[in-house]
Amino acid sequence: MKMTSKKMKDELMKKLSRPEWDCHYDSEKEVLRIEQTDSKKGINVSLPGVVAKWEVNKEKAIEEVAYYVQEALIAMHKEENSMAKILPVIRSTSFPKQSEEGNPFIMTDHTAETRIYYALDSNKTYRLIDERLLQKLELTEEQVREMALFNARSLGYEFKQETVAGNTFYFLNTNDGYDASRILNESLLHSMREKISGDMVVAVPHQDVLIIADIVNEIGYDIIAQMTMKFFAEGHVPITSLSFVYEDGDFEPIFILAKNRKKTDGKEKG
């Protein structure tokens, strides 16, 4: 039997037939492209080269090429899955802005006390994304931010509730490494705002806790201040000992509000 590029194309398509892969044949260039149906990422196989190998090794040449294509496409799929695990992490503004190797991290300003970093999660651990890793991922900073916020919205949440002196405190502590990151879920914040009757105070003292409080009196402010300081001191990855009043999508550090209150009180007394 004489092997031709067209016959080789048919042989390879038989071995590479999967519902998640598409095959396209360019008869002019004698190239077979096998790509993922969803992402369109794939491999181009020059058929004359495979035919030449077949003349020497026969069926073994076809098996080797098919194996190479399969492994490459599977690796691409795994890489895409890992990219789907890009998540935001909250850190203090004093946290380093670059890796130990000197590569700047991808960051976004958040509040006066916090900054958003981005992590490539591999289930067991994660690595903060710096400019070097960004190039390897072949993503833009904007794409990383969009993917991270999208994935943050998919994180589940279940609060424990405690009421002290009329003030209600909601605690989120799943220990998945992203408890503080839930502060970026705007729909979560809006839903909590609707159920809160007093001031909505939010705190992320360390990586593994998110506190949302319904503060109705001054005692509540004292409690949240002490609570946040305690969690901050005990946290494995501390973020900030300050808490924030959340209103209309903005976070206002409570110490600033306290200063403003003192100024107002002083003017009234005068």
Curated annotation (Swiss-Prot):
Pfam families, per the entry: DUF1444
Alphabetized InterPro entries for the sequence: DUF1444 (IPR010838)
Family named by the database record: Belongs to the UPF0354 family.
Designated name of the protein: UPF0354 protein BcerKBAB4_4524
